[in-house]
A protein has these predicted regions:
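PLP-dependent amino-acid enzyme catalytic core
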Residues: 1-416
């Protein structure tokens, strides 16, 4: 298990390599939650993610012989960028395995940072499948595997985020009640928690997971890491089916509690951060800020620091994020409604069912021959989310057999 001293040693190596990212007071969030909120902006790191820290330090610690043979890694994106950047700087070969579901923006960034020293292999639908292929390749080629989280040197490198936070807080004359840390495989929180509990043991360390990928919560509940059969890959940077053995043992010892944050709330937060203060975060990076909403009643008057772990957001995903945010906020809803197959039925629906400022966002209709009614897939955006119950009452009067797709996970997921 790593110690705070290991993190100090890692910082000596990394201080001339990585950016000492900003620790900024956030006036908007502070006023919103009645607290003093600071943001550690790892989205401003050289590869727009904290992952450079662990990757660089782990590779730096290899022997010259191991460096010459080359390294292998598996990553959903950010760890791969850290490895690629490092190998380009050190002029050593790297083979990087990425899930086929990885956003194109992250794949392109890996190529950019790695240049001629990196070969990319897209394998598997999840990180875990990609990691298994990478492990097999490592053995067959006699190279060194750089684990994205379950490695003590990687954890020590990630822990330098906490080293900087504590150092910057002292310079500002600030002390924190709690620190909110995104959790995927556990590399960041294991490093952060190790250092924080050594230098500021009274500070609460809170891990934040996406609700659809709570692998650390599952490990806490079972007493050991377990593999989740299915995960929501929306927050891809923290969507991990199974946490590491080494990261779990550190988290179990030092992390005070874990929170789950709905992917819709993450989307809403990500959009809010961009529109209000111009901060660009990826879903995983926004998770810690989203968690403020979950604990808003208990943080009033307190001083909190949130780590924005990354800012590698694919602009092509914004429509999905907007959709998730609207659904989470209770604005957008989907239904299957049987419409009378006669002229004027749609006008009647709009006049009788929708409020004056409500909107139809989706309308798919297939006319049925020789039938009095035909099913319509309809999306409705409410002007006031509090009118939801009234909408359901009016829908029931229009079609008692209507289907609310919010209760049908399979169909609902096809739309979002």
């Amino acid at each position: 298990m790593i110690t705070a001293n290991d993190i100090v040693k890692a910082n000596e190596v990394l201080k001339n390599v990585v950016e000492r990212t900003q620790l900024d007071f956030d006036r908007y969030l502070s006023e919103k939650y009645g607290a003093t909120i600071y943001i550690k902006k790892e989205n401003m790191q050289k590869v727009r993610s904290f992952k450079l820290r662990g990757a660089y330090y782990a590779i730096h610690q290899l022997s010259d012989e191991d460096k010459a043979r080359g390294v292998v890694c598996a990553s959903a994106g950010n760890h791969a960028q850290g490895v690629a950047y490092t190998c380009n700087e050190m002029k050593i070969p790297a083979t990087i395995f990425m899930p086929v579901t990885t956003p194109l923006q992250k794949i392109g960034q890996v190529r950019f940072f790695g240049g001629k020293f990196v070969t990319i292999k897209l394998v598997g639908d999840t990180f875990d499948a990609s990691a298994q292929a990478a492990q097999e390749y490592t053995k067959s080629e006699g190279m060194t595997f750089i684990d994205p989280f379950d490695d003590y040197n990687v954890q020590a490198g990630q822990g330098t985020v906490a080293y900087e936070i504590y150092e910057q807080a002292q310079e500002e004359g600030v002390s924190f009640d709690s620190i909110l840390v995104p959790v995927g495989g556990g590399g960041l929180i294991s490093g952060v928690a190790t250092y924080i509990k050594d230098v500021a043991p009274s500070m609460e360390v809170i891990g934040v997971e996406a609700s659809g990928a709570r692998s650390m919560r599952a490990a806490f509940d079972r007493g050991y890491p377990v593999k989740l059969e299915e995960i929501d890959k929306f927050a891809d940077g923290i969507a991990v089916q199974k946490v590491g053995v080494k990261t779990y043992e550190v988290a179990r010892k030092y992390v005070d509690r874990l929170l789950g944050v709905d992917e819709g709330l993450i989307s809403e937060t990500l959009i809010d951060m961009y529109s209000k203060v111009g901060t660009i975060a990826e879903p995983a990076g926004a998770a810690s800020v989203a968690a403020l909403e979950v604990i808003k009643d208990e943080i009033k008057g307190k001083t909190i620091v949130c780590i924005i772990s990354g800012g590698n957001n694919d602009i092509n995903r914004m429509p999905e994020m907007e959709e998730r945010a609207l659904i989470y906020d209770g604005i957008k809803h989907y239904f299957v409604v049987n419409f009378p197959q006669r002229p004027g039925a749609l006008r009647e629906f709009v006049n009788d069912i929708l409020g004056p400022n409500d909107d139809i966002t989706r309308f798919e209709y297939i006319k049925r021959a020789n039938k009095g009614k035909g099913p319509v897939l309809i999306g409705i955006a409410l002007s006031d989310k509090n009118d939801y119950d009234g909408l359901l009452e009016r829908l029931s009067a229009f079609d008692p057999s209507y289907i609310n797709l919010h209760g049908n996970e399979t169909l609902y997921n096809m739309l979002v």
